[in-house]
C-alpha cells in the first residue's frame, strides 16, 4: 500500500546515508530500482549514488537508455516522468565512473525540455569529465527566470565542486543560504583555482 511504499522510500534514503556500512544492501536497492513505484525507484537511485555503487552503473544506464523521448517522457495524467531521470543521472555522477557508455547515455538529456533535467545531466557530465563546458552550462542556468531552476543549478555546481563558477554563484538571485551551501560544496568537493581562502572570503561576504 501507499504507507508501506513510504516506509520503503524512507528506508532506501536512510541506507544511502549509512554508507559504507550499507554496502550489503546494494543488491536489494538494485531490485528496488525495478519497482513499479516511482518514489521507490527514485529513492533507490539516490541511495545507490550515495553509496558510490559501481555495480549499479549498468542498471542505471539501462533505465536511461531510451533517452528524453522514452525515460524522459511525461507520464499520462501525471507531471512525473516515465523514469526518475534527475535521480538516475545524479547517481551516475555520484558513482563517478567516467566511461564512454555512461557519457553516451547522459548526453541526450542535455536537450531535455525540463531545465532541471538539463541541469542534472550537466552536473553529471561535469563530475565525470571535469570539462569546463558543462560547468558553463550550469552557470547559464543560474540566470534562468525560474527560481527553482536557479536553486537546482546552484546545488549542482556545489555538488560538482566547479570552482570557476564561484562568482556566478555569489551573484545568483537566490537565497544566501543556498549560495552558501553551493560555495561550501566548492570548498569540500573541488580543487584548483580559486583557492579555499578566496572561497571562504566569498562565503563571509554573504553572511
Where are each of the predicted segments found?
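Short inter-helical turns and helix N-cap capping residues of alpha-solenoid HEAT/ARM repeat scaffolds
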Residues: 3-4, 36-37, 67-69, 81, ...
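Structural signature of alpha-helical solenoid repeat scaffolds
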Residues: 16, 49, 89, 93, ...
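Glycine-rich, flexible loop segments associated with nucleotide phosphate handling
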Residues: 3-13, 76-92
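Long, ordered, amphipathic alpha-helical scaffolds
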Residues: 115, 126, 147, 154-158, ...
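Conserved hydrophobic register position within alpha-solenoid helical repeats
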Residues: 11, 44, 88, 121, ...
Amino acid at each position: 500500500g501507499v504507507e508501506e511504499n513510504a516506509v520503503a522510500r524512507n528506508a532506501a534514503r536512510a541506507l544511502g546515508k549509512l554508507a559504507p556500512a550499507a554496502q550489503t544492501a546494494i543488491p536489494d536497492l538494485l531490485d528496488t530500482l525495478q519497482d513499479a513505484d516511482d518514489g521507490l525507484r527514485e529513492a533507490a537511485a539516490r541511495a545507490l549514488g550515495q553509496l558510490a555503487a559501481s555495480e549499479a552503473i549498468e542498471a542505471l544506464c539501462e533505465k536511461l537508455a531510451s533517452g528524453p523521448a522514452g525515460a524522459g517522457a511525461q507520464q499520462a495524467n501525471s507531471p512525473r516522468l516515465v523514469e526518475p531521470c534527475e535521480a538516475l543521472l545524479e547517481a551516475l555522477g555520484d558513482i563517478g565512473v567516467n566511461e564512454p557508455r555512461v557519457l553516451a547515455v547522459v548526453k541526450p538529456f542535455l536537450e531535455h525540455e525540463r531545465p532541471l533535467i538539463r541541469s542534472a545531466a550537466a552536473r553529471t557530465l561535469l563530475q565525470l569529465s571535469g570539462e569546463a563546458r558543462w560547468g558553463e552550462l550550469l552557470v547559464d542556468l543560474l540566470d534562468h527566470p525560474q527560481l527553482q531552476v536557479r536553486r537546482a543549478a546552484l546545488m549542482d555546481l556545489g555538488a560538482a565542486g566547479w570552482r570557476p563558477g564561484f562568482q556566478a554563484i555569489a551573484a545568483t538571485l537566490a537565497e544566501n543560504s543556498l549560495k552558501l551551501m553551493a560555495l561550501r560544496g566548492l570548498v569540500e568537493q573541488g580543487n584548483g583555482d580559486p583557492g579555499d581562502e578566496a572561497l571562504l572570503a566569498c562565503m563571509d561576504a554573504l553572511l
